[in-house]
Amino acid sequence: DDALAAPARIDVNWLLRSMFQSVPGRGGMPGSTGLLPPQWLDEEMVNAAVRAVGRTLQASLLSYGAPQGYLPLRKQLSMLLRQSTLIEVSPQQIVTTLGATQALDLIARTVIVPGDHVLVDEPCNGNLIKLIRLCGGVPIGVPRLADGPDVGALAQILGRHKVRAFFCNSTFHNPTGAGLSPKVAFAVVKLAVEHDFLIVEDDVYGDFFPGVRQTFAGLGDLEHVVYIGSFSKSLSASLRIGYIACGLQLLEPLIRLKLLTSVAVPGLISRVTSAFSANGTGIKNKVPLCIAII
């Protein structure tokens, strides 16, 4: 396959294109997708959710979805976050998106002004660096350690630059798989308050954690933390459902930008995701298997 052949230069564009190609002769998928093998996911539960929604199709499915997102799903997300991360957020503070990719894009375009210094994990997803640069931001790497961002290095950077935001993973950092300790989470949030920058917490792999997980947003400061989650990794990439939990100061700007760029998340996939969530997150049943194989 030409798209998988090694190019003269391996860059973000090549990596993105390779995500949609099968691995020749192996029947698998490239590692760049960040997805689990289909057999690790709950295909039958997804099928059941699709059938359930199909039996109760309503006229509302023939129109645009709600700009902020399907309310029953946002209520479920509020409960899910409280149970799995200790994040206290109301459904009114949640915006659904077309996957975590759109969530990152909306936040970046809302908060970054050309010339802003924007921190990222080092290493991090190359797509994120390109997105920040598209918004005119100047990305600066913060070394990632086994228990989270290097707090000492972060403090040094903050002493040299006025920082607008820090985009980082919490659970299962991409690409190292590192976690986040309570001590480091508290230290990073404390620096965010002292230096007045926004932590953009990308927790798309959080559903793979078997218990209550440590997050930045779980420390109770949605004024300085924006939380991103997604069902694309743990449920189905084709459903493209992500979400943002944030403080009220960012809520309306994000909804307005979402309206301008995509109008709404389709009502059908929102209802399918809601029906699936009502029966529990399928990946939770697969966590012991995932850990055993890894």
Give the predicted meaning of each segment.
Residues 50-196, 200, 206-220, 226:
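Conserved core of the PLP fold type I
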Residues 212, 220-253, 265-268:
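Active-site PLP attachment segment
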Residues 202, 269-273:
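Acidic catalytic patch
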Residues 172, 249-250, 281:
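Short, well-ordered alpha-helical scaffold segment located
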Residues 2, 33, 144, 210, ...:
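Active-site donor-binding loop signature of nucleotide-sugar glycosyltransferases
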Residues 36, 170-173, 233:
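Short glycine-rich anion-binding loops that position phosphate/pyrophosphate groups of nucleotides
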Residues 1-51, 255, 259-265, 274-280, ...:
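N-terminal basic, amphipathic alpha-helical segments
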